[in-house]
Design a protein with these regions (language model features):
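N-terminal [4Fe-4S]-dependent radical SAM core
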Residues: 1-74, 86-94, 108, 112-114
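Auxiliary Fe-S-binding modules of radical SAM enzymes
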Residues: 1-35, 214-291
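Conserved residues at beta->alpha junctions
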Residues: 44-45, 76, 124, 152, ...
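Pocket-edge positions in alpha/beta enzyme catalytic cores
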Residues: 64, 94, 126, 186, ...
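Active-site anion-handling motifs in enzyme catalytic cores
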Residues: 97
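Conserved AdoMet/S-adenosylmethionine-binding subsite of the radical SAM
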Residues: 100-103, 107-255
Length: 291
C-alpha cells in the first residue's frame, strides 16, 4: 500500500494522549515475543511501509471497518454500519483503551506470567507512536512485577524511545535494510537515527535483542547480513534473532481490500535460513530462528 506524504505518520510527532491508547489486538499465550508465556498488545499506527508487513491492519492509526464475506447476508441497501449489521459481518479494526482498562485486561493473565517467567510485550504497528501511554503502562506493570518488553524499529527521537526502553526488561529491536538510501526509499526509515538509537540503548545498559527479518529480495542476502553483523560486533551483543518471511498476513490484505506486493514471494528455504545463521555463528553470535 502506498500512502502520500500527507497521509503518513511519524514518530517525530508528539502523541499527547498519554491516558488513552489505540490498539487493534491483544494476543494471549504467545511464545514468540519474548521469554515465557506472553500477552502481546498490538498498538495501531506505523510510520513505515515495509512491503512484507504481516499486519497491514496495524498501519493506519485510524479505526477501520472491514466486512467478512463469510458472514455477509448481502442486504440491500448495505449501510456499512457496524452497529446495524444483522449478521455481524462488519467489524471494527482498532479500539481506544484507557490505562486502567488495559492494565486490568492484561493482568488477567498474571498467573501465566508467574508460572512461565513470561510477561507483556508491546508490538504494533509501532509502539513509539504512542510512547507516552506505553511508558506509563509499563511502569504500572512493573509495579506488579510483570516482565516487560517492546518490539520496535527504533525510528523515533531518542527522547521518546529512551523513557519507554527504560521500563523494559527486553527491547526486541528490528534491524532491517542496512543501506540508508534503500531503507528510506523502500520502508521510509531513517537508518542513521535507528542505528544511533540502538547504540544509545546499549550504552544505557538496556537489554537489547536485535532481530533481522529475512525477506526475499530485501534482507535475505549475505551483503545485508554482513552489514548487520559489522554493526553489532562493536556493541558486544552476541544474541541475534532471525525472523524468516512468511505468508500469514496475506488473508489480512484481502480482508482490507488491498493488494499485497509480496503475495508471490516464496518464504526462505531451510538452506537459505541456515546460510544466514552460519554467517552470524561464525562471528560468535548465539542465533535464534524465530522469537
Amino acid at each position: 500500500m502506498t500512502l502520500s506524504a500527507a497521509q503518513r505518520i511519524s514518530c517525530d510527532v508528539v502523541e499527547t494522549r498519554a491516558e488513552v491508547a489505540r490498539i487493534f489486538n491483544i494476543q494471549r499465550y504467545s511464545l514468540n515475543d519474548g521469554r515465557g508465556i506472553r500477552t502481546v498488545v498490538f498498538f495501531k499506527g506505523c510510520p513505515h511501509r515495509c512491503p512484507w508487513c504481516a499486519n497491514p491492519e496495524s498501519i493506519s492509526p485510524k479505526i477501520e471497518t472491514v466486512r467478512r464475506e463469510s458472514k455477509c447476508l448481502h442486504c440491500t441497501p448495505c449501510l456499512w454500519d457496524v452497529d446495524e449489521c444483522p449478521s455481524g459481518a462488519f467489524e471494527p479494526i482498532g479500539r481506544d483503551v484507557t490505562l486502567e482498562e488495559l492494565v486490568n485486561e492484561v493482568m488477567k493473565d498474571d498467573v501465566f506470567f508467574r508460572y512461565s517467567g513470561g510477561g507483556v510485550t508491546l508490538s504494533g504497528g509501532e509502539v513509539l507512536l504512542q510512547a507516552p501511554f506505553a511508558t506509563q503502562f509499563l511502569q504500572r506493570l512493573r509495579r506488579f512485577g510483570v516482565h516487560t518488553a517492546i518490539e520496535t524499529a527504533g525510528d523515533a527521537p531518542l527522547s521518546r524511545l529512551m523513557p519507554l526502553a527504560r521500563q523494559c526488561d527486553e527491547v526486541l529491536f528490528d534491524l532491517k535494510i542496512m543501506d540508508a538510501d534503500l531503507a528510506q526509499s523502500i520502508v521510509a526509515m531513517n537508518l542513521p537515527r535507528v542505528l544511533d538509537n540502538f547504540r544509545q540503548l546499549v550504552a544505557d545498559g538496556i537489554n537489547v535483542i536485535p532481530r533481522v527479518p529475512l525477506i526475499p529480495g530485501y534482507t535475505l542476502n549475505e551483503t545485508n547480513m554482513a552489514r548487520v553483523l559489522a554493526f553489532l560486533l562493536p556493541s558486544g551483543i552476541r544474541q541475534l534473532h532471525l525472523l524468516p518471511f512468511h505468508q500469514y498476513g496475506e488473508p489480512k490484505y484481502r480482508l482490507l481490500g488491498q493488494e499485497w506486493g509480496m503475495r508471490q514471494a516464496i518464504p526462505p528455504t531451510e538452506d537459505e535460513v541456515s546460510a544466514m545463521r552460519q554467517l552470524a555463528e561464525r562471528e560468535g553470535f548465539n542465533v535464534t530462528v524465530g522469537g
